[in-house]
Amino acid sequence: MQGPHLSLLLLLLATMGAVLQADTVEELTNTRGLIFLEDGVWPPSSPPEPLCLVAVRGEGDTSKASLTVVGGLHSYEHAFLEAVQESRWGPQDLATFGVCSTDSQTTLPALQRLGAWLGETGEQQLLVLHLAEVIWEPQLLLKFQEPPPGGASRWEQALLVLYPGPGPQVTVTGAGLQGTQSLCPTRDTRYLVLTVHFPAGAWSGSGLALTLQPSKEGATLTIAQLQAFLFGSDSRCFTRMTPTLVLLPPTGPTPQPAHGQLDTVPFPQPGLSLEPEDLPHSADPFLETLTRLVRALRGPLTRASNTRLALDPGALASFPQGLVNLSDPVALGRLLDGEEPLLLLLSPAAATVGEPMRLHSPTSAPWAAGLARRVAVELQAAASELRDLPGLPPTAPPLLSRLLALCPNDSRSAGDPLRALLLLKALQGLRAEWRGREGRGRAGRSKGTGTDGLCALRELSVDLRAERSVLIPETYQANNCQGACAWPQSDRNPRYGNHVVLLLKMQARGAALGRLPCCVPTAYTGKLLISLSEEHISAHHVPNMVATECGCR
């Protein structure tokens, strides 16, 4: 019974030491395992909000890593940290924290991680933020105090700790939470914990928006019931216990075991830009320039090896594409009608190193003048369209101009149509690949990035001040959906349909889709807006204003 009172007394003594500008720093130790250090350890540039540095003492009186508290550490927050540190996560401990199950919750791993951190020696700090503001209507919003300057950018996960009063089992959703989470309080429950992903919105935005739905069908919580449930009574101080936001330290790389077999994968070597001296020598300036253009548009490659690819013409003839007789104008006309890739097989004599690789043979390939003019016209059109594509590297236009100079550019002259055909097919392939990159950029919501992960709800604040008719709110948390749509589909939203399942399977098999599956909102909630009309001020509940769930469509 004396532990919490002693903790408060020691904290008071530490604060008095800072006020008196003590020259020495002493550790004030209580009997429950936490060490309160004097405020004198903080530099003069500390933020104006009072800070408390707390270190955890483990078994054997060993010094542990410290945690930072914005404001003073309450006795019930102190008790929560001790309960986490001492838990062995059996059934009784799960009941203490209101954990429903061990297989479908994200809360238990986060609590275990916090407990392991409290029991280890380290230099990183744990940040504890107190509640600054709560809004009950039209939606529950919890806003917390700001962390010290420069100390919030590296926090990626947090625990929202509730010190509950009596209440039912509920399902909790909201922006910032890691999916839908459940709370299962019992008579033995002292704490309820929710996992928050990227918690910066808890202090920089409008706050954490939470929706609590009782598990009993048709039941709802009134504001009075919600207040009694989330803000438990502190019988010692005759006050309410307010929620706390505990920012977990970033997860470091997992150490490899010292025993067993270790599979190692070397880091890929950085790509090397192929300078002119790095390119394989070719006696034909056309082929050499075309190689430079292809490599400039397809990005930097690793240094070329001396390995040559041996192609068997007999095996290639059995491929579905088949072989095209370039001396047949009809076959060449069909080739121009499509944009399929073209593979030219040269004779071994023409491919000899140091010998010019001539692609034209006027005596063996009598082209019709009309077909040659068509090749020249389409070549100029493809080159013009390629120049207009956004984001081309600066080396591409000069190389393209040189290639056109090496090809017949007069539509009235047959010239060397085989060389022009080769350039035309190359430009068609490069144009299609560059368009595909642009399309993948536009479909970024579907494919996502390395930091986005799977399709999930993300925080998005919308500014309504541009809508002059809307008075309140000026900004609100509308949320958005972002992330990868891939097979197997994430089970965060079980209401996806068979149509998107088939699309995702086709995408996984590499099938071409006109539209990739996209991460979009699948459920919304309304928002209360106060607007100004010509006659009066009115309040309207506008539907579909806040995205609450995401899925692939």
UniProtKB/Swiss-Prot annotation:
Mainly expressed in granulosa cells from preantral and small antral follicles. Residues 1-22 form the signal peptide. Coiled coil: none annotated. Disulfide bonds join C455-C519, C481-C550, C485-C552. GO terms for molecular function: growth factor activity; signaling receptor binding; transforming growth factor beta receptor binding; type II transforming growth factor beta receptor binding. GO terms for biological process: anti-Mullerian hormone receptor signaling pathway; gonadal mesoderm development; Leydig cell differentiation; Mullerian duct regression; negative regulation of ovarian follicle development; ovarian follicle development; positive regulation of gene expression; positive regulation of SMAD protein signal transduction. The record marks R445, S446 as: Cleavage. It is found in: Secreted. GO terms for cellular component: cytoplasm; extracellular space. Its main location: secreted. The keyword Glycoprotein applies. Glycans are attached at N325, N409. InterPro entries: AMH_N, Cystine-knot_cytokine, Muellerian-inhibiting_factor, TGF-b_C, TGFb_CS. Keywords: Differentiation, Disulfide bond, Glycoprotein, Gonadal differentiation, Growth factor, Secreted, Signal. Residues 23-445 form a propeptide. Preproprotein is proteolytically processed to generate N- and C-terminal cleavage products that homodimerize and associate to form a biologically active non-covalent complex. Binding of the non-covalent complex to AMHR2 induces dissociation of the pro-region from the mature C-terminal dimer. The N-terminal portion of the protein, despite having no intrinsic activity, has the role of amplifying the activity of the C-terminus. Belongs to the TGF-beta family. Plays an important role in several reproductive functions. Induces Muellerian duct regression during male fetal sexual differentiation and plays a role in Leydig cell differentiation and function. In female acts as a negative regulator of the primordial to primary follicle transition and decreases FSH sensitivity of growing follicles. AMH signals by binding to a specific type-II receptor, AMHR2, that heterodimerizes with type-I receptors (ACVR1 and BMPR1A), and recruiting SMAD proteins that are translocated to the nucleus to regulate target gene expression. Homodimer; disulfide-linked. This is Muellerian-inhibiting factor. It comes from Rattus norvegicus (Rat). The gene is Amh.
